[in-house]
Regions:
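Interfacial aromatic-anchored transmembrane helix boundaries in multi-pass membrane proteins
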Residues: 82-98, 104-105, 109
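Short helix-perturbing small/polar motifs within transmembrane alpha-helices
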Residues: 99-141
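Membrane-helix boundary/juxtamembrane motif in polytopic membrane proteins
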Residues: 139-162
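Cytoplasmic-side transmembrane-helix entry/capping segments in multi-pass membrane proteins
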Residues: 90-101, 119-125, 148-154
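Structural signature of hydrophobic alpha-helical transmembrane segments
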Residues: 61-73, 120-127
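Hydrophobic alpha-helical transmembrane segments in multi-pass integral membrane proteins
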Residues: 106-119, 161-177
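Hydrophobic transmembrane alpha-helices
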Residues: 20-69, 79
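C-terminal ends of transmembrane helices
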Residues: 77-88, 136-144, 198-199
């Protein structure tokens, strides 16, 4: 257990060090504003962590023979998530484990939800409504300005409406319900994380 904890700590430190070094060099070369350095470090760390997490999910999807539904899920989730924001765990390993466990749960429940589409549609409609009302959670690490937050909320509402239309179109075209369930669950998960961020006040007040 101790060895595992140390390994997790080393991973986080290594990711932060890579980000600090790279962004520091770009700041020295005047490619990045000094005032924006902290934000760029945060975004770069997010990119590395996302690469590790998404890579792991794709590998697991191959094991379950769910690669293509998973790709649809990831596209829907990542496109919406980067605009809505939402709850973040404070450590990468926690976020990573939560993501993997969440994906495994999705693999299990997607089969059940695809057999009961009325429940799936009711929940995704509620999720779309929630995102439409809230829009975006302004995470403390991003600390968006009022204009940036307004633009992000507008983008989130546009994307969730677009994704909702795609899901509806797939249903009308009688597409495989497994694919539909993965796309719908992506929207539902984004809405859930957005609501959790609001509940736990993990945001900068406007």
């Amino acid at each position: 257990v101790c060895a595992l904890s140390e390994a997790k700590g080393m991973t986080k430190t290594m990711i932060e060090k890579i980000a600090d070094d790279l962004i520091g060099q770009m700041t020295e070369a005047r490619l990045i504003d000094k005032e924006m350095e902290a934000r760029y470090v945060y975004v770069f760390i997010c990119w590395i962590e996302k690469f590790i997490t998404v890579g792991s999910i794709i590998v697991i999807s191959l094991m379950f023979h769910k690669l293509f539904p998973t790709i649809f899920f990831l596209v829907f989730f990542l496109e919406l998530r980067k605009r809505t924001g939402g709850y973040h765990l404070d450590k990468f390993y926690r976020c990573y484990l939560a993501s993997i466990v969440s994906y495994l749960v999705i693999v299990i429940i997607s089969e059940k939800l695809s057999e009961h589409p009325q429940w799936l549609f009711a929940i995704v409609l509620l999720a779309i409504t929630g995102i439409g009302l809230i829009g975006t959670a302004n995470h403390p690490n991003m600390h968006m300005t009022s204009d940036e937050l307004m633009e992000s909320k507008k983008s989130a509402r546009t994307i969730v409406l677009l994704e909702g239309c795609i899901i509806l179109g797939c249903v009308l075209l009688d597409a495989d319900m497994v694919y539909v369930s993965y796309m719908a669950i992506a929207v539902i998960l984004c809405a859930a994380l957005l609501c959790i961020a609001k509940i736990f006040k993990q945001e900068v007040k406007e």
